[in-house]
């Protein structure tokens, strides 16, 4: 029964669509009508309001940190259930007919909550890739791939969860992958 409560509460926290809420409140617009139509931080940056984009990023990270850290310290056996549920809440929010974001910021919150070093592996990989390419999507894919790769190569740690997360992030970026392949992907300005 506890795992159901963990899963549901983590999903509900993860499903709070901060990009949608913030653009509605501060810009009086629907973020789904802007840029890629995605509710996440990268598309929030495309609104032209960097503060709104960074606020979305921080809130999307936080909505994963809260349930995952709580579960980590109170129900550690369910940490991956909480993590996956928060991620799925962001990607498939009940409030927006299950059409959410791509889950990268939420995944960053998950990583830092599980192990700060894994969060750093992602951030460093993301930053290096972004500095070279200027593609947020490619950076997100590389960052999410580097976490299980790091665990496989350098740690004696079960990387199955992180491989699953990479596959899910790849899935949420499938259109970006097509655009990258066709050299049609839009570069991202983060500053």
Curated annotation (Swiss-Prot):
It is found in: Cell inner membrane. One of its GO terms (molecular function) is acyl-phosphate glycerol-3-phosphate acyltransferase activity. GO terms for cellular component: plasma membrane. InterPro entries: G3P_acylTferase_PlsY (IPR003811). Pathway: Lipid metabolism; phospholipid metabolism. Its main location: membrane. It is a multi-pass membrane protein. It catalyses: an acyl phosphate + sn-glycerol 3-phosphate = a 1-acyl-sn-glycero-3-phosphate + phosphate. The chain crosses the membrane at residues 3-23, 51-71, 78-98, 108-128, 150-170. Its EC number is 2.3.1.275. It holds the Pfam family G3P_acyltransf. GO terms for biological process: phospholipid biosynthetic process. Keywords: Cell inner membrane, Cell membrane, Lipid biosynthesis, Lipid metabolism, Membrane, Phospholipid biosynthesis, Phospholipid metabolism, Transferase, Transmembrane, Transmembrane helix. Belongs to the PlsY family. Probably interacts with PlsX. Catalyzes the transfer of an acyl group from acyl-phosphate (acyl-PO(4)) to glycerol-3-phosphate (G3P) to form lysophosphatidic acid (LPA). This enzyme utilizes acyl-phosphate as fatty acyl donor, but not acyl-CoA or acyl-ACP. This is Glycerol-3-phosphate acyltransferase. The gene is plsY.
């Amino acid at each position: 029964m506890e795992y159901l409560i963990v899963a549901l509460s983590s999903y509900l926290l993860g499903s709070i669509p901060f990009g949608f809420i913030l653009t509605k409140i501060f810009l009086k617009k629907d973020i789904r009508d802007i840029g890629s139509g995605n509710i996440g931080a990268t598309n929030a940056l495309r609104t032209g309001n960097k503060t709104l984009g960074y606020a979305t990023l921080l809130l999307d990270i936080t909505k994963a940190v809260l349930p995952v850290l709580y579960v980590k310290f109170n129900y550690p056996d369910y940490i991956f259930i909480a993590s996956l549920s928060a991620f799925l809440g962001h990607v498939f929010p009940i409030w927006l007919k299950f059409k959410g974001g791509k889950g990268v910021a939420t995944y960053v919150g998950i990583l830092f909550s599980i192990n700060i070093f894994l969060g750093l592996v992602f951030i460093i990989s993301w930053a290096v890739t972004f500095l070279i390419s200027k593609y947020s999507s490619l950076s997100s894919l590389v960052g999410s791939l580097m976490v299980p790769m790091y665990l496989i190569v350098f740690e004696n740690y079960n990387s199955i969860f992180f491989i699953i997360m990479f596959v899910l992030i790849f899935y949420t970026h499938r259109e970006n992958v097509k655009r990258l392949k066709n050299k049609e992907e839009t570069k991202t300005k983060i500053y």
